[in-house]
Amino acid sequence: MPYFNVRHSNALVVTNFKVMFSSFKKTANFDKIKRYKAHLLIKHSRPQVHFTVRDPYQKALSLYKDKFQKIPQNADLTKPFKWEKPQRVFFPAMGLSTKHNSNLDIQQALINTSFDEFVQLLAKCYWKDEHIQPQHWILHHPNYLLLKNLGIPAERLSVYKMDQADDMEAFAEATGFDFSNRANSTGKIKTPEKISPESLQTINHIYQQDFVDFDYKMRVT
């Protein structure tokens, strides 16, 4: 879960998958905790909560490059292999099944999916996995039966855009985050040169509230 207690400090870090989660796991003074522990700390210890967010277009691109390109391209199918949940949630819309399709079939289907096709699939399943859900859901999750709301008062919530250098410098100063641990797992995977207007419209619709809440500009072209 993407919640971290900042050691030796009355502070928490909250993020989403594909928003520096891997980097935070490598940070020595960040201790990963579960949602219920974060909720208890917020309620009883009144920490400052540092929340990192990402441009929704870049987050979608990063997930596509990781789950639909990097992982299948590097999968060793000569050994037992299990596809990750943020891949499997797409399978029904792709007509795939781990019971009826071979890993090779699935590998090729993922790799051969264009980014625009990925976005159309995303619209059919984005609520099914935390990697692809709207970022603001982590603060107040509509699908959780328990602990829907983390209960963070506005005055104790600091929001940082990971794509803004000034924001991340402020985040590092506030939390002790070491930039040398920053991971870029998909840096070598080619980024699609252009996002179609149809895909932009779909991303705008899915993540509309993220654009509003975190002051990201929507694109139409």
Briefly describe each language-model feature range.
Residues 3-9, 151-154, 196:
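Short, surface-exposed loop and linker segments with low hydrophobicity and enrichment for Pro/Ser/Thr
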Residues 35-51, 58-191:
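PAPS-dependent sulfotransferase catalytic domain
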Residues 156, 179-221:
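Charged phosphate-binding loop/patch that engages nucleotide di/tri-phosphates or the phosphate backbone
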Residues 30-33, 177, 216:
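Short aromatic/hydrophobic-glycine micro-motifs
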